[in-house]
Design a protein with these regions (language model features):
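N-terminal secretory signal peptides that target proteins for export/translocation
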Residues: 1-6
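Catalytic glycan-binding domains that act on GlcNAc-containing polysaccharides
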Residues: 26-161
């Protein structure tokens, strides 16, 4: 059974791709940001840092895991994502990938607060590596965007769908 959200996303994505756009529509960034209460500019900066905005990017890691798509979702998330009806092939769909990346970031924010440490945790577990990663992301933010500011208090723990 296909979920209505997924069907609507597929229709929007096919319309978007039919017009030859290289990147997901702004609505994908905004929808994910609103759903998971994170900044759309921050999501975009993470995607720029992770994949150079390439929705087909695949990164191979020294530990044997892979990073998939626009937001470079690590393959270690695949078992968890499968319980939400998302498989590896789905992660090459830019809007799905953005939503999953936003969900991961929101989990970090829930644990660490809306901080650069939470941004760094998107990519690294060690504090020094988190800081270095957050600095890379910060450089990809538009100049008018300040450091993460705390959004309204979270009231739900949404899934990546």
């Amino acid at each position: 059974m296909q979920r209505p959200w997924r069907r609507a996303l597929a229709v929007r994505l096919s319309i978007h791709l039919a017009f030859g756009a290289a990147l997901p529509a702004q609505a994908c960034w905004d929808d994910a940001a609103q759903r998971y209460q994170v900044s759309s500019a921050l999501l975009y900066a993470i995607a720029r840092t992770e994949s150079g905005l390439n929705p087909q990017a695949i990164g191979r890691n020294g530990n044997g895991s892979r990073d998939i798509g626009l937001m470079q979702i690590n393959s270690s998330w695949l078992p968890t994502l499968a319980s939400h009806g998302i498989n590896e092939r789905d992660l090459f769909e830019p809007c799905i990938n953005i939503h999953v990346g936003a969900w991961i970031l929101a989990g970090n924010v829930s644990r660490l607060g809306y901080t650069w440490d939470a941004v760094g945790a998107y990519n690294a577990t060690r504090p020094a590596l988190r800081r270095a990663y957050a600095d890379k992301v910060r450089r990809h933010l538009p100049a008018a965007i300040p450091a993460p500011a705390a959004p309204a208090r979270r009231t739900t723990s949404a899934s990546p769908r």
